UniProtKB/Swiss-Prot annotation:
InterPro entries: Kinesin_motor_dom_sf, Myosin_head_motor_dom-like, Myosin_N, Myosin_S1_N, Myosin_tail, P-loop_NTPase, XRCC4-like_C. Residues 835-1921 form a coiled coil. PANTHER family: MYOSIN HEAVY CHAIN, NON-MUSCLE, MYOSIN-16. ATP binds at residues 181-188. It comes from Canis lupus familiaris. GO terms for cellular component: cytoplasm; myofibril; myosin filament; myosin II complex. One of its GO terms (molecular function) is actin filament binding. Residues 1116-1137 are annotated as: Disordered. This is Myosin-16. The keyword Oxidoreductase does not apply. It comes from the Eukaryota. Residues 35-84 form the Myosin N-terminal SH3-like domain. The keyword Lyase does not apply.
């Protein structure tokens, strides 16, 4: 299925024939003859299996007649049963009766020949490549499958996709679709269809967020495929559109299932295809698309010709693909670029790089004559490449032919031959294409990242299929390894995890081993010492080749692994195979040629550098990251470079982890034949793929197992409808309920299993349950429809009955009218009756019209009020939406800040790790350099000693030769003179022979010594060269260290700037969680630093151990050297003894000469000298060893001290972390309360909206009532009353809405105020955090400076020691070798002694100045002691006054507590009265409602009375009774009026009181706010004072550091001058010792002063604690009375004075007296403040009493109102009695009405007129009474409203008091924080004092070391004198 989307739109073609067989075809198949016992399948070589019919059976042999009329005899095991015809083209092969290979193959073959390519196979889907377009992928088919179950539609890829989409939404879990199969099986096309389906299902239809006219997100997701196919797909032997890379496409969805973005991960692009292809294959499509000449302007701009044969790299195989138009594909690719938002510059860059790669392949090189150097044949191609890639042509050619290579520390140009140049450009072309492809993927991901909220994703995997070619290389191994892992994942998921879940859930199950474990092959590839591991190892070896790689593979795996085979020989054609691997899909022979280079992937660094400077932006962007890895490789010690296989395996492991975290859906693609012909089936090929993919095993486990499962709650909820009666009412366990439900359904027990948490079903059972559920729901809906239709018909029948009754009444009245129409009286009645009602009707009409107008105006007002409320609700909802939008924006900003912070912290940690690594390496190099320099010096000394020994031996040899000649001459003279003494001559001859032997022996020894000396010189030269190299490396490391130090400083400065910016941002965002996260990150970083320090400590210890071992080795060498020297000395002693014997013999012979004696003396002197030198060398080695041990101990002590400091910092940070966690918990609790209140407010708003909707409905009802008033005149009054009642209800609701609105606005204001307070506290916390960080940084810097100074001192001391030793050795050697230089040395020493005298005089002057300082300090100490005594006396007096003040404060506190108790009791009484008032109010409301009902009844009775009066003729008595009733009503009305006026007056009084209280509360609140603001300003001033104090401390520390630096400088000067102090050193030592004593005495005095200072500080601390106690007590008074501002100001001023005193104590010791005096002043101020506070407290008590009296008065008023309400209730009861009397009178009137009907005809007009006039008067009076009654009701409601407002106001006041208390508590917390900061500052001051003492001790140590150096110089002087005497004696 090659690329593109054409031909798939089959909306005008019926797709069903391509999905499922038609009914006619199915019926024809079912009618075919079939015998279950005879129909079978037998094997066939061509068809795989062929149908047949069993003829006979004989034992194990079966005779079968095939459909080809052939009779065959086969074994019974080779015969497979045939399925019944009803399974013709089964959609799910798991449903077949007989599951065997023949049935599966036949089913797939039948469906494929009919182009039904999709078939279910249990839980997954099998698809066969049709090799042509089918109309089954259009929008029509997609809509058919959308939202459908799997069983409802024929098999299709869309069904699997829709199930994955449904599972994602239902199970809330990520999904993945694994589309696997061999190469050419159709994976890429199926992947495109899946992505297209998901894009359509979850499409939003929105344009991209860029606003550049791009397509929607779904269009961009779909259009990503053409770009990736153009650059990543190519033609292979088995597939015209083969993906030569792997991709995993994640399609992200939001919570509603809509698309939210996508991203793509690519795996292992086949780079080698860029430069080489096999014969029947082609390169990547993009090359041929560009060369198709569809865009001539593109060809022209890229300098190309439209013929692929002109370009070597793309024309090694075929250049045209059948059924693929490259020009059309180029247009599709270009359009896809536009849809994906690629800019024109990016497109041109991509095309230029692609064209440049094609030109790159045409570069030719030739060999220079008589040189191993290649050169470019023609520069035309290079010029084209340079033009397209933005390079310099000459530099490009030079970089390819003569690249720069680093050799040691220098770069040299290396010549390249032709083959190397071709390999270089090939590697560059592959690298450009690979990086461009990766950049394309990143760029597409950037477009598809929409920044929308992502909830879940569905991943679609498309990996290159399993490949078996004639030539299989490294790429095929990686592809096949990936497929092996995916097949193992499938097997593990389908067969292992499934059965493990059965066991886990407790289902009876026998584990089945399907034999599909591929772990052996995977282990062979990826485990340690596997193929990939060996490949990595060989890449590291410098001289590894393909042969060594092959040998390593054979040694490790041949014969040891069944999956590793040696290739079979004898093919004779094709490339050579080096080894074979047994994969799940077959055995593959691999050729390992070039694997090492492919894995290392080397590049020409010179050309890469040119690429980085390219003018083509895209090329420079692709290679700019080449610099970073180089640096990182240098910085990562011991880490190997990242190879291709290593990188690919990391990617694959991440992919497998992603797949394990998702729910997989498998689609297995099948290749039908190897000829790419549609409809042709290769049975053996298909069966091989089915066996390899585990299709049959998957069907078996699906049939045997329980593939479907559900959780018990879900099963109960979904299927309870099948039998709801079986589950009892009440609580029932879900598992028990499911068991009962399953037991009541007609299901076999074997068809399901009950697990611990789930119920499991066999295949198809869940679909059966779904069908049963659908049937049950259909029945329920049918029954419901029946009931509803019956109900509606009954209503219609009632209406019909009512109409029938109405018709009968009309008919009866008509008949009566026809009977009476001619009766005279009836005619008279008809004439008179209208005349009677004319006048009254006109008045009634006017009255009604007036009432109607009033009602209409009221309704208009009501409508306007409703509109206003709607507008207010709209504004409130708009404000709410704005707040939510602001909150979301703030949250997004916080998330962005967190991400930026995490990135910055990561970069910071990386930089710190790099810096620590560089420091470690630098320290190692310094240590090695130091050790090598020490060994160098030692070897130089030994070499000089050996040279001297050699010179001495040479002189000795010359002397012995001279002596030998003299002896020979002597013998000859003696033989001539003493010829008669032959015996003596013979004796002398013997002695001569002995001397010759001895001489020969000495010569041999000398030769051995010369050889040894030569060997030592050689080793010395080697060591010197190594030392030079190490020195060069050390210099380079110094440079690197300097660069790293600069980078570190820059990074630190950048980091500080970014941290400051982040702090500013955090202060503006009002979010405290950021601070907590930042603190956590800092703690983690400190922990990581602590771990790094621990690792550094361990490495240093390890290195120290190594140095100790090295020292031991050197000591062993020294011992060996000593033993060798002892041997030489022994030989020399033997030689001297022999010489002595010889001299004795010569004396016996003729006496020794004076020369021989002198020579013996010289030899003895030389021997003594050698012994002395050996002893000195031993002393030197021991001194060196002792210095090394001392350094080791010092370094260990420093490290332990550093570790302890880090531990202290860690503990402090952990405490801070705990504090911040507690603050976070508090903030979370407050946020929860805020959220709860917000939810309550939203609930109130919803209630208000409901009430508004009800009000709207009632307004509509009012309008209908008005319409009915016009229609029905008789019911006008009743409905008018109803309208007024509803109006009043709506008015009350409206008032209630307004009150709720005010409460909501007040809550919003409270929330805003709380938010402001939180922001202020957060900003204060941030400021304090920044201050502490700054202090910590300062302390760290000081500590580092001190450590640096200490190390500098140690280095100087060691340097002085080495200089002393070098001078000593040099002086001794010079004294021994040359006597002439001694005089010059003496002169130099005299000059230096003169200088030393000058320095000694300077030291004496300095000592005198120190003596003066001592005297001055002693005077200051005496003054300080006097001041201390005065301060102690003042402190004692202050203590006494403080105790008195404490007693006064305790008394006031007791009084305040009593007042608090009284206030609490009054508040309790107030609450009790409030509850009683609420009860009275509710009773009053009930009485009002009752009164309204009575009024309504009264109105109805009045109307009835009017009607009766109209009909009465003689109604005198009734008129009299009505007059009585009227009088009664008037009396009651007057009583009510009086009561209402009294209540109104009392309410007005209460209202004035409430207003006055509100004014007072507002004034108190303003005072409190003002005081809080002043307190905050005071706290800010305090903080600034603290900051100034800390800065002054810092300044003093800096001054102290400068003084220490000055002392160090002077000390260095003294140490440099020590070498010149030789003559007057004794005098200087004496002065120095006196100075040391003086310093010690001064230090002791300073220590005593320090003790006194500590005691004074302790006393001040006690005073400060007492003042803190006063402040706490005063703060308690402030919480209750809020009037103690002046006292707090005084205490704050005193606290400031105390802090200034602490600072002054650390700087100067002579200001204690001034501080004590200031304390006395503060004490007096405090006493005056306390008196003022007491007076103010009394005033506040009086105010509280007056407020209490006012509250009691309000309570009495409330009681009076309650009494009035009781009276009103009694009045209502009285009205109830009147109502009952009215009912009695109504009954009487009804009786009288019957009589009046008889008398009505008898009465005259005159009585009727009188009665009518009387009735009118009564009606007018009644109307007046009603109006007065309405006004009284209004006044009552008004009073009630005022009462509610008063209650609400009191509640608000109570809330404000609570808020003020909370504010005071927060202020107290702030005070505590500030006090804690003061304590920390004091701790820092103490630490600085401790450091000062420490520096004094170090100065003492330095002076002691100087004394030791001076004693050493004295010893040296004495030795020099002894040597001088010896020289003078010589």
């Amino acid at each position: 299925m090659p690329g593109g989307y054409k031909g798939e739109c089959g909306d005008d073609v019926d797709p069903m024939p391509f999905l499922a067989p038609p009914e006619k075809e199915r019926i024809e198949a079912m009618n075919k003859p079939y015998d279950i016992k005879k129909s079978c399948w037998v094997k066939d070589e061509k068809e795989g299996f062929i149908a047949g019919e069993i003829q006979s059976e004989q034992g194990d042999q079966v005779t079968v007649k095939t459909v080809n009329n052939q009779t065959v005899t086969v074994k019974k095991d080779d015969v497979q049963q045939m399925n019944p015809p009803k399974f013709y083209q089964a959609s799910d092969m798991a449903d077949m009766t007989f599951l065997n290979e023949a049935s599966v193959l036949n089913n797939l073959r039948q469906r494929y020949t009919n182009m039904r390519i999709y078939t279910y196979s249990g839980l997954f889907c099998v698809t066969v490549n049709p090799y042509k377009w089918l109309p089954i992928y259009g929008a029509r088919v997609a809509n058919m499958y959308k939202g459908k179950k799997r069983t409802e539609m024929p098999p299709h890829l869309f069904s699997i996709s829709d199930n994955a989409y449904h599972d994602m939404l239902m199970n809330r879990e990520n999904q993945s679709m694994l589309i696997t199969g061999e190469s050419g099986a159709g994976k890429t096309e199926n992947t495109k269809k899946v992505i297209q389906y998901f894009a359509n299902v979850g499409g939003t239809g929105k344009q991209s967020s860029d606003g550049k006219g791009q397509g929607s997100l779904e269009d961009q997701i779909i259009q990503a495929n053409p770009v990736l196919e153009a650059f990543g797909n190519a033609k292979t032997i088995r597939n015209n559109n083969s993906s030569r890379f792997g991709k995993f496409i994640r399609i992200h969805f939001g919570t509603t299932g809509k698309l939210a973005g996508a991203d793509i991960e690519s795996y292992l692009l086949e780079k080698s295809r860029v430069i080489s292809q096999q014969a029947a294959e082609r390169g990547y499509h993009i090359f041929y698309q560009i060369l198709s000449n569809k865009k001539p302007e593109l060809i022209e701009s890229l300098l190309l010709v439209p013929n692929p044969k002109e370009y070597h790299w793309v024309s090694q195989g075929v250049t045209v693909v059948e059924n693929m138009d490259d020009g059309e594909e180029l247009q599709i690719t270009d359009v896809a670029f536009d849809v994906l938002g690629f800019s024109a510059e990016e497109k041109i860059g991509i095309y230029k790089l692609t064209g440049g790669i094609m030109h790159f392949g045409n570069m030719k090189f030739k060999q220079k004559p008589r040189e191993e150097q290649a050169e470019v044949d023609t520069t035309e191609v290079a010029d084209k490449v340079s033009h397209l890639m933005g390079l310099n042509s000459g530099e490009l050619q030079k970089g390819i032919t003569r690249p720069r290579v680093k050799v040691g520390n220098e770069f040299v140009q290396k010549g390249q031959n032709v083959e190397q140049c071709n390999n270089s450009i090939g590697a560059l072309g592959k690298a450009i294409y690979d990086k461009m492809f990766k950049w394309l993927v990143v760029r597409i991901n950037k477009t598809l990242d929409t920044k929308m909220q992502r909830q879940f994703f569905i991943g679609v995997l498309d990996i290159a299929g399993f490949e078996i070619f004639e030539f299989n290389s490294f790429e095929q191994l990686c592809i096949n390894f990936t497929n092996e892992k995916l097949q193992q994942f499938f097997n593990h998921h389908m067969f292992v995890l499934e059965q493990e879940e059965y066991k886990r859930e407790g289902i009876e199950w026998v584990f089945i081993d399907f034999g599909l474990d591929l772990q052996a092959c995977i282990d062979l590839l990826e485990k340690p010492m596997g193929i990939f591991s060996i490949l990595e190892e060989q890449c590291v070896f410098p001289k590894a080749t393909d042969a060594t790689f092959k040998a390593a593979l054979y040694d490790n795996h041949l014969g040891k692994s069944n999956n590793f085979l040696k290739p079979k020989g004898g093919k004779g054609k094709g490339p050579e195979a080096h080894f074979e691997l047994v994969h799940y899909a077959g055995t593959v022979a691999y050729n390992i040629t070039g694997w090492l280079e492919k894995n290392k992937d080397p590049l020409n660094e010179t050309v890469v550098g040119l690429f980085q400077k390219s003018s083509l932006g895209l090329l420079a962007l692709l290679f700019k990251e080449e610099e970073a890895p180089a640096g990182s490789k240098k910085q990562k010690r011991g880490s190997s470079f990242m190879t291709v296989s290593n990188f690919y395996r990391e990617q694959l492991n991440k992919l497998m982890a992603t797949l394990h975290s998702t729910a997989p859906h498998f689609v297995r693609c099948i290749v039908p034949n190897e000829f790419k012909q549609s409809g042709v089936v290769d049975a053996h090929l298909i069966m091989h793929q089915l066996a390899c993919n585990g299709v049959l095993e998957g069907i078996r486990i699906c049939r045997k197992g329980f593939p479907n499962r559900m959780q018990y709650p879900e099963f109960k909820q979904r299927y309870q409808v099948l039998n709801p009666n079986v589950i009892p009412q009440g609580f029932v366990d879900n598992k028990k309920a499911s068991e009962l439900l399953l037991g009541s359904i007609d299901l076999d027990v074997n068809e399901y299993k009950i697990g611990h948490t789930k119920v499991f079903f066999r295949a198809g059972i869940l679909a059966k349950l779904e069908d049963m559920r659908d049937e049950r729901l259909a029945k329920i809906m049918t029954m419901l429809q029946c009931r509803l239709r019956g109900f509606l018909m009954r209503i219609e029948f009632k209406k019909m009955l009512e109409r029938r009754i109405g018709l009968k009444v009309i008919q009866r009245n008509t008949r009566k009218f026809l009977e009476l129409r001619f009766w005279g009286w009836w005619k008279l009645y008809n004439k008179v009756k209208p005349l009677l009602n004319v006048a009254r009707q006109e008045e009634e009409m006017k009255a009604k019209e007036e009432e109607l107008r009033n009602a209409m105006s009221k309704t208009q007002e009501l409508l306007s009020r409703v509109k206003e409320l709607e507008e207010k609700m709209a504004t409130l909802s708009q404000e709410k939406n704005d707040l939510t939008i602001q909150l979301q924006a703030e949250q997004e900003n916080v998330i962005d800040a967190e991400e930026r912070l995490t990135q910055m912290m990561k970069t910071k940690m990386d930089l710190e790790s790099q810096i620590s690594d560089m420091r470690e390496r630098l320290e190692e190099e310094e240590g090695t350099a130091a050790s090598l320099s020490a060994t160098k010096r030692k070897l130089e000394g030994e070499m000089s000693d050996l040279k001297r020994d050699l010179e001495g031996l040479e002189t000795t040899l010359a002397k012995t030769e001279k002596e030998k000649q003299a002896l020979d001459h002597r013998v000859r003279t003696l033989t001539g003179d003493l010829s008669l003494r032959e015996d003596s001559i013979a004796k002398l001859q013997k002695e001569k022979r002995a001397l010759e032997e001895l001489h020969q022996k000495t010569l041999d020894d000398l030769q051995a010594e010369e050889d040894k000396v030569n060997h030592l010189t050689k080793t010395n030269s080697k060591l010197s060269t190594q030392i030079h190299e190490l020195e060069d490396n050390w210099e380079q490391e110094k440079k690197i260290r300097a660069e790293v130090e600069k980078a570190r400083r820059k990074a630190e400065s950048d980091l500080k700037m970014t941290i400051d910016n982040l702090n500013d941002m955090e202060r503006s965002k009002l979010d405290l969680e950021e601070v907590v996260k930042k603190r956590d990150m800092e703690i983690n970083s400190v922990n990581s630093k602590y771990e790094d320090e621990q690792s550094l400590n361990s490495t240093l210890q390890r290195k120290l151990k190594e140095h100790q071992a090295r020292i031991e080795e050197l000591e062993e060498e020294l011992e060996a050297e000593r033993s060798m020297r002892a041997k030489v000395e022994k030989q020399r002693s033997d030689l001297s003894r022999d010489l002595e014997d010889l001299s004795d013999r010569l004396e016996e012979a003729g006496g020794a000469t004076s020369a021989q004696i002198e020579q013996n003396r010289k030899r003895e002197a030389e021997l003594l000298k050698l012994r002395r030198e050996l002893e000195e060398a031993a002393l030197q080695s021991e001194a060196a060893a002792s210095t090394l041990r001392k350094k080791h101990t010092d370094s260990m002590a420093e490290l332990t001290e550093h570790v302890e400091n880090l531990q202290r910092v860690k503990s402090k940070l952990e405490k801070d972390k705990q504090v911040m966690k507690a603050e976070i918990d508090d903030l979370n609790a407050s946020m929860e309360t805020v959220q709860k209140s917000k939810m309550n407010a939203e609930a109130h708003i919803r209630k208000l909206e409901d009430s508004l909707s009800e009000a709207n409905a009632k307004v509509a009802e009012l309008e209908r009532n008005q319409a009915e008033i016009n229609a029905v005149r008789t019911r006008l009054q009743a409905e008018n009353g109803e309208l007024s009642r509803e109006y009043e209800e709506s008015q009350s609701r409206l008032n209630q809405i307004l009150r709720i609105k005010t409460s909501l606005t007040s809550q919003v204001d409270d929330y805003k105020r709380q938010l402001d307070e939180e922001s202020k506290s957060r900003s204060a916390a941030m400021v304090s955090l920044a201050n502490t960080k700054h202090d910590l940084d300062l302390v760290k810097e000081q500590l580092e400076e001190e450590q640096g100074g200490k190390s500098e001192l140690q280095r100087l001391v060691s340097k002085l020691n080495t200089e002393v030793t070098t001078w000593r050795t040099k002086y001794e050697t010079d004294a021994i070798q040359r006597t002439e230089e001694l005089e010059e040395t003496k002169r130099k020493l005299a000059a230096r002694l003169q200088e030393a005298e000058e320095t000694a005089e300077a030291a004496q002057a300095r000592a005198a100045s120190l003596e003066k300082n001592k005297q001055r300090l002693q005077a200051e100490v005496e003054d300080l002691t006097i001041d201390l005594e005065k301060a102690n006396a003042a402190a004692a007096a202050l203590d006494k006054k403080q105790r008195v003040f404490d007693k006064m404060l305790a008394e006031w506190q007791q009084k305040c507590e009593e007042l608090q108790v009284e206030v609490d009791s009054s508040q309790k009484e107030c609450r009790m009265y409030m509850t009683e008032s609420f009860k009275i109010k509710t009773a009053y409301e009930e009485s009002l409602e009752h009164l309204e009902s009575v009024k309504k009844e009264n109105k109805t009775l009045q109307e009835e009375i009017k009607e009766l009066i109209d009909q009465l003729g003689e109604g005198g008595r009734s008129v009299h009774e009505l007059q009585k009733l009227k009088k009664k009503l008037e009396i009651e009305k007057e009583e009510l009026q009086v009561a209402l006026e009294e209540a109104e007056s009392s309410l007005e009084v209460e209202e004035s009181k409430v207003i006055r209280i509100q004014l007072e509360l507002a004034q108190v609140k303003a005072d409190i706010d003002r005081r809080i603001h002043e307190k905050e300003e005071e706290f800010e001033a305090t903080r600034k004072n603290h900051q100034r104090a800390i800065e002054s401390l810092q300044a003093s520390l800096e001054a102290e550091a400068k003084g220490r630096a000055e002392a160090l400088r002077l000390k260095k000067k003294m140490e440099t001058d020590l070498n010149e102090m030789e003559i007057q050193l004794d005098h200087a030592n004496k002065n120095n010792s006196e100075l040391v004593k003086t310093l010690k005495r001064l230090q002791q005095q300073i220590k005593d002063l320090q003790v006194q200072m500590d005691e004074d500080a302790r006393q001040h601390e006690e005073l400060r604690e007492q003042y803190n106690l006063q402040e706490r007590r005063l703060s308690l008074l402030q919480t209750e009375l809020e009037e103690v501002r002046s006292g707090l100001e005084g205490s704050e001023r005193s606290r400031k004075l105390l802090e200034q005193e602490v600072v002054e104590i650390t700087e100067r010791h002579n200001e204690v007296n001034i501080q004590n005096q200031s304390l006395l002043v503060v004490k007096r101020k405090l006493e005056s403040d306390v008196q003022r506070i007491s007076s103010e407290h009394e005033e506040l008590i009086s105010e509280f009493r007056s407020a209490d009296e006012r509250a009691k008065k309000a309570m009495t008023d409330a009681a009076r109102m309650a009494e009035e309400l009781r009276q009103e209730q009694d009045h209502c009861m009285h009205l109830e009695k009147i109502k009952k009397n009215y009912e009695i009178t109504i009954k009487d009137l009804q009786a009288k009405m019957e009589e009046a009907e008889q008398l009505a005809l008898k009465g005259g007009k005159r009585t009727i007129m009188k009665l009518e006039a009387r009735i009118k008067e009564l009606e007018t009076e009644l109307d007046g009474e009603q109006k007065q009654h309405v006004e009284t009701v209004k006044t009552l409601r008004k009073n009630e409203r005022r009462l509610k407002e008063l209650v609400f106001q009191t509640e608000e006041d109570h809330k404000t008091n609570q808020r003020m208390q909370e504010l005071v508590e927060k202020l107290q917390n702030k005070l505590k924080v500030y006090k804690r900061q003061i304590e920390e500052a004091e701790e820092q001051a103490n630490q600085t004092l401790a450091r000062y003492r420490k520096t004094v001790h170090e100065l003492d140590d330095a002076e002691e070391r100087a004394g030791m150096a001076e004693t050493a110089l004295n010893k040296l002087r004495t030795r020099h004198r002894v040597a001088g005497k010896g020289i003078t004696s010589v």
